[in-house]
Curated annotation (Swiss-Prot):
Specifically methylates the pseudouridine at position 1915 (m3Psi1915) in 23S rRNA. The lineage of its organism: Bacteria, Bacillati, Bacillota, Bacillota incertae sedis, Caldicellulosiruptorales. InterPro entries: Alpha/beta_knot_MTases, RlmH-like, tRNA_m1G_MTases_N. Belongs to the RNA methyltransferase RlmH family. GO terms for molecular function: rRNA (pseudouridine-N3-)-methyltransferase activity. Keywords: Cytoplasm, Methyltransferase, rRNA processing, S-adenosyl-L-methionine, Transferase. This is Ribosomal RNA large subunit methyltransferase H. It comes from Caldicellulosiruptor saccharolyticus (strain ATCC 43494 / DSM 8903 / Tp8T 6331). It catalyses: pseudouridine(1915) in 23S rRNA + S-adenosyl-L-methionine = N(3)-methylpseudouridine(1915) in 23S rRNA + S-adenosyl-L-homocysteine + H(+).
Amino acid sequence: MIKVICVGTIKERYFKEAAEEYKKRLSRWTKIEEIEIKEEDENKYRNVEMLLKKEAEKILKHIKEGQYVVVFDINGTQLSSEEFAELLDRKVSKGEEIVFVIGGSNGLADAIKKRANLLISFSKLTFPHQLFRILVYEQIYRGFTIIKGIKYHK
């Protein structure tokens, strides 16, 4: 099973449709669960660290002992699509649950990064949150097509 925990919501219909399409495609190979964590209001907190701590508490409630946690972070390791597919294959073939965590506009608290088994960076570039979620789903889908030998990845 794959769980995707996201801070923030998708607002635009076309991003929602893209996410739903990838989740539908993935459903033939794995169960996929998406959890949206409401992004905290910056005006309620004295500083960003307190805001991130509150979001981290909400995220950690959805992560169980024994789950393999992958956090997306600009300072993480960059993987090729084939390496990402190998990671998926190793975990899914053993029946392990993988949890992908996507931070909000303020990033993620250190507590989440410390809980991660792996930090992954897609790029040094900054992406809009909604678009990044689609990129994550696309890479998970691409990974499964590589694993299954389906012509999609070039």
